[in-house]
Swiss-Prot record:
The keyword Coiled coil applies. Residues 168-280, 394-449, 487-807 form a coiled coil. GO terms for biological process: actin cytoskeleton organization; adherens junction organization; anterior neural tube closure; cell division; cell migration; negative regulation of actin filament depolymerization; negative regulation of microtubule depolymerization; neural crest cell delamination. It is found in: Cytoplasm, Cytoskeleton; Cytoplasm, Cytoskeleton, Spindle; Cell junction, Gap junction. The keyword Ribonucleoprotein does not apply. Keywords: Cell cycle, Cell division, Cell junction, Coiled coil, Cytoplasm, Cytoskeleton, Gap junction, Phosphoprotein. This is Cytospin-A. It comes from Canis lupus familiaris (Dog). PROSITE patterns: CH.
Amino acid sequence: MKKASRSVGSVPKVSGISKTQTVEKTKPENSSSASTGGKVIKTGTTASLSKTKSSDDLLAGMAGGVTVTNGVKGKKSTCPSTGSSASAPAMTTVENKSKISTGTSSSTKRSTSIGNKESSSTRERLRERTRLNQSKKLPSAGQGANDVALAKRSRSRTTTECDVRMSKSKSDNQISDKAALEAKVKDLLTLAKTKDVEILHLRNELRDMRAQLGINEDHSEGDEKSEKEAIIAHQPTDVESTLLQLQEQNTAIREELNQLKNENRMLKDRLNALGFSLEQRLDNSEKLFGYQSLSPEITPGNQSDGGGTLTSSVEGSAPGSVEDLLSQDENTLMDHQHSNSMDNLDSECSEVYQPLTSSDDALDAPSSSESEGIPSIERSRKGSSGNASEVSVACLTERIHQMEENQHSTSEELQATLQELADLQQITQELNSENERLGEEKVILMESLCQQSDKLEHFSRQIEYFRSLLDEHHISYVIDEDVKSGRYMELEQRYMDLAENARFEREQLLGVQQHLSNTLKMAEQDNKEAQEMIGALKERNHHMERIIESEQKGKAALAATLEEYKATVASDQIEMNRLKAQLENEKQKVAELYSIHNSGDKSDIQDLLESVRLDKEKAETLASSLQEDLAHTRNDANRLQDTIAKVEDEYRAFQEEAKKQIEELNMTLEKLRSELEEKETERSDMKETIFELEDEVEQHRAVKLHDNLIISDLENTVKKLQDQKHDMEREIKTLHRRLREESAEWRQFQADLQTAVVIANDIKSEAQEEIGDLKRRLHEAQEKNEKLTKELEEIKSRKQEEERGRVYNYMNAVERDLAALRQGMGLSRRSSTSSEPTPTVKTLIKSFDSASQVPNPTAAAIPRTPLSPSPMKTPPAAAVSPMQRHSISGPISTSKPLTALSDKRPNYGEIPVQEHLLRTSSTSRPASLPRVPAMESAKTISVSRRSSEEMKRDISAPEGASPASLMAMGTTSPQLSLSSSPTASVTPTTRSRIREERKDPLSALAREYGGSKRNALLKWCQKKTEGYQNIDITNFSSSWNDGLAFCALLHTYLPAHIPYQELNSQDKRRNFTLAFQAAESVGIKSTLDINEMVRTERPDWQSVMLYVTAIYKYFET
């Protein structure tokens, strides 16, 4: 049964060759192979069952069914029968007849494939060679060996063709989402065929499982012979009886299907109890066809079996399927071996192309090694075969693990991409609403600007009036209206240009948005039309199926009527024969009566004759009536035959029409697929347009923020003019009061400065203690190397001269700054309070540090604003161990008093030497300060107060300035303070980007690395953990299941908390505990459960990605 199904299943469907011809060709081939090899197999009628398989099942049959010529070997195969072996012959016959009628559509559909034609030509050449070999009928083993070698060469060619077909099927699977519509139509067309295919699969798999588990292996050839005889006896003579038997067998087939499913589940549970799993599949073609170069040899075997034994130089080294591994394990216990290398290849090929349609199909991977039942080989090779099988199991496990990882990574990336697409759609909607809101705000701002311009004109008239009053009273004032009017005109012109550009860009954006919305509506309409077309096609298909069912029912009714008429004709024939016999008897009686008449009384004889004549007339009338009834019955039978012929012609025409409709459906499907590809391209174009719109919206926001700044400047100017009108008479009193307050603040500032000097003295004393320790170390180093001491003395002398010059220059700069501060603490306090906080001891020390680093161009202070990004990330306080804190606190703490005390003590001769010693000691032990450069660079990033001090010096007036000039100063100072504010140097684009990064920290990472946010975060993790051992981050699930990835990622920031060299991948709980504790020590809350992470091999990738995002947000943003 197994061999017959595989041999015909491997033959592809070719146009122009009918099903019945294929079946007729298969029957003599199988019968001749059975007579030559001395083994009995079932007839080829069961082979037509495999013709209704789908494309994947056809490939599976091709991979496993090339062994059709193995019947020439003459080996006896024990085919264990299923539980329902009694009803199997009749059922097989019924299935063969049904497959002849139901497989025509699939054969016509697949006839266009070039690969199938090549496989068909190869199959025909193989069949012709097999016929020639069978016609010779040579009983010798040498001739059988030549036939087997020829079959093996044909098998290698067919296996190559299988490789080509497998690559094509893989390329089709890559566009599975585009072929979803085609799959639906195909499922509807093959709905009536899948049940029979599943029955055949379950039968074959049940035999394979029983062969593996050693159940019912002692079946004789008598069963096969009896099944064959039953098949021949039960073959129907006409189509009508076949249809009747099909209807009768339908319920039996369903019951057997349920029984086979139950047995299949039972065997599956039994295998799971033994510790094996059949759900792992081989999806890699390299594993399958890597052993095609094996050269099998034919060794003559026992002549009583009529064949030979197949051996190979690398017996058992090829990787087998899971079923082969199970069979090898069972056969090792039973001292038998049922497989070899080429059969393993067959079973693997059939497994690779086997589709998994349901949970019960997990066992549906036919293996030819168990079905063929190859005899056992020498015991000396069992050890090497066992070792090779262990190596094969290890390779299979590794490859399966790799394929599972790739599959999970791909699904994870697809889920992340879909989620980001949904986020982008939401962002697009938000941007559209924001754009509309900005348009409304722009209208409101334009109205407000018009109102402010009206107020400005009104205030300008009032100012002219007040100036005329000042001129009448001979009060002097500063005339700067020309400069102001020019600046106002320039600002107004710029604002009008910006407003015009904004309106033009908004119109463009609205046009693009309308175009995109129209395109989206058209795409939705096309999709709706495609769905409607698919629904219509489905309805049409259902209608055709209903018509076919009604025709079949009508045909069955006609067949039943014909049977009734035939039975009536037969009964009439029997009655007519009986009457003929009765007539002969009556004639004999008449003859006897004539003889009696001649010898006896005539009157009595005449009465008898009269009665006999009456009976004769009655019999003749009855015979004539029966003949007329017979003629009518024959006419009715002829009419019914004509009706049946017409119905068959109509059925053939309907089949041709159905084929045409299927071709039209395929063409429609191709059109839908092309339209779907066009929709995909349009979707990608829409995505690109969305990205462009996002950039334009960001630019629009930047322009809007800039416009807001200009408008705020104009509003501030208007407010200042209004305040100037009201405060002009009270300005002098206010200034006197402020002078008194600022003098008090200046005294407080001097007291704070004295406190800072005291603190600096304390720091200096600590630094001197550290310097003493460093001097002792330097003395020890000088004793070790005298040559270096001389060089150090030379360097020391040069450094002393340089440091003295720096200290003197610094003292001069400090004195100038202090003088400027004393002079500028007057009116400049008003402007400085609006833009800067009150100076404290910390800010003074930082300003002195930044001033002391000005002569060194590499350590120049970088002014930083609250919103500007930091030039270098510094680790938090928890990232430094206590030993590192102690070693870092020396150079950092001792560098401050060198500059903080320079204004009070300008004649320190030892300061350059000590500073030089500190630098020398810091360079002599770089291993103890692995992260000191980052801390020192962080020290240089301080807020510089030089710009504000220069501004104060510029706007400060002499102490004896006139009140009018002070009032003029008051009008200009707010403008200067606005331009010197910390947020003035940040552009609107930078502000919006910083807000976006704070809201979504992965957006900047996605812009940096490109692609999706998930891939960008994955690349960042790979870059951060580069160089760490046992770390391979490919996804956010299985790559993090041992905790080493978390430890490596946090070790880059917190090396004191994680001893990475002491960790291993086996102690998962310790790894996760260290990583989560280190993250919690700096404020990163743990969102993962340690027990769940330790227990599961593949944690939830979204939870892991969320936690890694929190780590990135804390340390990198």
